[in-house]
Amino acid sequence: MKKSLMALIVVGSFLLSACALRPDTIVNTPLTARPQAASTIAPPANGAIFQAAAYRPMFEDRRARLIGDTITIVINEKSSAGKQAGSAASKTGSVTASAPNVFGLLGSLTNRLSASGSNAIKYEDKGAVTSSNNFISTMTVTVIDVLSNGNLIVAGEKQVSLDKGSEFIRFSGVVDPSTVNSGNIVSSTQVADAKIEYRTNSTVDGAEVASMLARFFLSVLPL
């Protein structure tokens, strides 16, 4: 009795935790970064007016350039694809046979002994597949690294908790600073190597995992 009760408790704990599962991700980079600590060594003075270490353009807004800066990504992704395939094949054949006439003997009889046949095979196959996706959202990501050419590696995650679960929007990619608009805004279509995903851990996803766990434990319970 105690073993059965403990097994039921274990099953119940898995069922409750299934709803809080964090879905897997295709974004394999850190999702945020903190600004680098200021150096205690004074940067070299490489000019009387222009200082590369503290350069900020005079006639433009403050733009993301350093690790820890933020950029707003406007996600507007649309994709559609279609594929059609078809094949056809046919084959026909015929055969005739007759009995030989041996030295003219039994000619009248063998002329009547003949056979013929024909066959036809036809095959045709057609298929079509279409797919269409539309993803529109806005999120702010963090610069996690700066490449040697000045391009920015950005990544971030946005979580939205709803009544029956949580939604996860994750993003990563490489941003060319010249494509960043006023207000530190860039379109997702201008981000290189972009990885965009939308996942949930709603009760539907949790129910699928819970169902598998329940079947496993119920199969070993002495009920």
UniProtKB/Swiss-Prot annotation:
Topology relative to the membrane: Lipid-anchor
Signal peptide: 1-18
Keyword Transmembrane: no
Any one GO molecular-function label of the UniProt entry: cytoskeletal motor activity
One record GO biological process: bacterial-type flagellum-dependent cell motility
Subcellular localization(s) per the UniProt record: Cell outer membrane; Bacterial flagellum basal body
Pfam family, one: FlgH
Subunit-structure text: The basal body constitutes a major portion of the flagellar organelle and consists of four rings (L,P,S, and M) mounted on a central rod.
Family: Belongs to the FlgH family.
Protein name as it appears in the record: Flagellar L-ring protein
Source organism: Herminiimonas arsenicoxydans
